[in-house]
Regions:
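Small-residue (G/A/S/T)-rich helix-start motifs and N-terminal tracts that mark the onset
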Residues: 1-98, 225-227, 236-403, 407-418, ...
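Nucleotide and nucleotide-moiety/phosphate-recognizing core
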Residues: 47-160, 166-205, 369, 378-382, ...
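Generic structural signal for helix capping and beta-alpha/helix-loop junctions
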Residues: 102, 126, 212, 330-331, ...
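Short gly/ser/thr-rich secondary-structure transition/capping motifs
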Residues: 121, 130-140, 209-213, 274-279, ...
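Short, small-residue-enriched loops and turns at beta-alpha junctions
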Residues: 124-125, 161-163, 358-360, 407
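Structural alpha-helical scaffold elements that stabilize or flank donor/cofactor-binding regions
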Residues: 146-147, 221, 453
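Internal gly/pro-rich beta-alpha loop/helix module
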Residues: 152-153, 158-267
């Protein structure tokens, strides 16, 4: 990624995410040169909070804001943001979920008139009484939760990218009381910029605390955000499900990172890079030069799958479609895509399994037998006993395996085999290969299980969902 122009750099930053380690490495030279990243981050956060309040018709001077502040730099970002908001008239209470607070941020917040509520009896925060009883600790925790529940805005600055994974202790209890405990958020899908109009609004500082920063997993309590203000570069959890569902609208604050030498961990498919994969037609093209796609899809029970898959194939600029399936599907395909050709023949790519049940009728059995026979040509031998036929498998045309064909997949296949399961289908495929996993496990850690499926089968994995991996 050397030699990025600023336009290209910004394009990458909008469509790609970098690991927490890479972000730290990109921050380092800026910090060494005295760039005030924390002040930049906090100013952006305060600006977003003020805008959200304005959009909801709440004057900053009449607003109640609760900051959930951790001990590290993420808490410092939150404290400096809270300082700016308090300085402009907001009533802000900082709830310390750890034993310490960022020193400079805490001092500035107190000078601005901010209030502080300590939850840990063993805290070591200057000027704040500690050593209170367990009973009082419980009362303070309940008071903090009630304050947050009645606030206009909650600012989540508990951990940021300093902790990846489940929250524990006081932070975990607070998140569990105010948010969700280990499940995917049940939220209405609203157009960008729209709000439910319900308080409190939640602003996450950099990332929502408690989500898997680098893998997007949700394994414990967290507070779903309405807006996440992230700094320097997107983190994987902002793009990967299920954590991506907890981030709300994402605002990226550009720190002018030098991204040369850093490979994105996650990339979003954009119109531009999708277009790069499409072969443009040539003046002298014939239908065979443009390529032929073969489809074994649909069934008597799901004939629509045959029609949809053939119509989709016809939109991809290919030269010809060959379709194989039961009579009811053949009739419907020809009605919808009259240029389709029925029956066997040479193809340059295959799509199989969509709408094919697991042998509910004799026609289904015939289709499954046809698919199984095709898939044998893609089977690789074991690493311990390589076979000359492996070269032939690698030379086979690209193949998409979906739905009813997934259970017919050989043990190991070359990477031009693309499997397209949803969570339940992937769980079944993995279970058949000895993994102890169900659909909910896949939904909670989709990246982990998609990678595991690739490791076990060798196939390219496209795990379908609201966000597809």
């Amino acid at each position: 990624m050397a030699g990025q122009t600023d336009e290209n750099r910004l394009h990458v930053l909008r469509h790609a995410a970098f690991t927490a380690r890479d972000v730290r490495e990109m921050e380092r030279p800026l910090l060494e040169n005295g760039v005030p990243l924390m002040r930049m981050a906090s100013a952006a956060t305060a600006h977003v909070v003020a805008e959200m309040l304005e959009d909801e018709g709440v004057a900053l001077e009449e607003s109640n804001i609760v900051l959930l502040a951790g001990s590290g730099d993420n808490g410092g970002d939150g404290l400096f943001a809270a300082t700016m908001l308090a300085g402009n008239g907001a009533s802000v209470t900082a709830v310390a979920v750890g034993r310490t607070l960022h020193g400079e941020g805490f001092a500035a917040f107190v000078r601005a008139g901010g209030k502080v509520l300590i939850l840990d009896p063993a805290s070591e925060i200057p000027g704040c009484a500690a050593g209170f009883s367990a009973g009082e600790a419980g009362e303070r925790l309940r008071a903090a939760v009630e304050l947050a529940q009645h606030a206009h805005v909650i600012i989540d600055a508990m951990t940021g990218i300093g902790l990846s994974g489940a929250l524990h202790g006081i932070a975990g209890t607070v998140a569990s009381s105010l948010g969700v405990d280990g499940t995917i958020p049940d939220r209405t899908a609203l157009p960008a910029g729209d709000s439910t109009g319900e308080f409190p609004l939640v602003v996450a500082v950099d990332v929502p605390s408690g989500v898997g920063v680098d893998d997007g997993a949700i394994t414990g309590p967290y507070i779903p955000a309405d807006v996440t203000v992230t700094f320097g570069a997107l983190k994987p959890c902002l793009m990967l499900p299920p954590a991506a569902y907890a981030c709300g609208r994402v605002t990226l604050v550009d720190f002018s990172f030098d991204i040369d030498g850093h490979m994105p961990f996650v990339e979003a498919v954009s119109g531009d890079n999708a277009a790069e994969t499409v072969r443009l037609p040539r003046l002298a093209d014939t239908k065979y030069l443009r390529g032929v796609t073969g489809l074994i899809t649909g069934s008597e029970r799901y004939p629509g799958a045959a029609v949809l898959s053939c119509k989709a194939a016809a939109k991809t600029n290919i030269g010809m479609i060959r379709y194989m399936g039961p009579q009811v599907c053949r009739d419907m395909v020809l009605d919808a895509v009259p240029e389709a050709v029925l029956g066997k023949g040479r193809v340059q790519a295959w799509v199989v399994g969509s709408g094919v049940p697991t042998g509910e009728t004799e026609d289904d059995d015939f289709q499954r037998e046809t698919i199984a026979k095709l898939l044998t040509h893609y089977a690789l031998s074991s690493d311990d006993d390589p076979d000359d036929d492996d070269d032939l498998a690698y030379d086979m045309p690209p193949l998409v395996v979906d739905a009813g064909a997934l259970d017919l997949l050989p043990d190991e296949v070359p990477p031009q085999v693309v499997i397209t399961p949803h969570a339940g289908e992937l769980a079944s495929l993995l279970t058949a290969r000895g993994e102890d996993v169900d659909a909910s496990d896949v939904q909670n850690e989709p990246l982990h299980w998609a990678l595991r499926a690739h490791e076990l089968t060798g196939a390219t994995v496209l795990l379908k969902g609201a966000v597809t991996i």
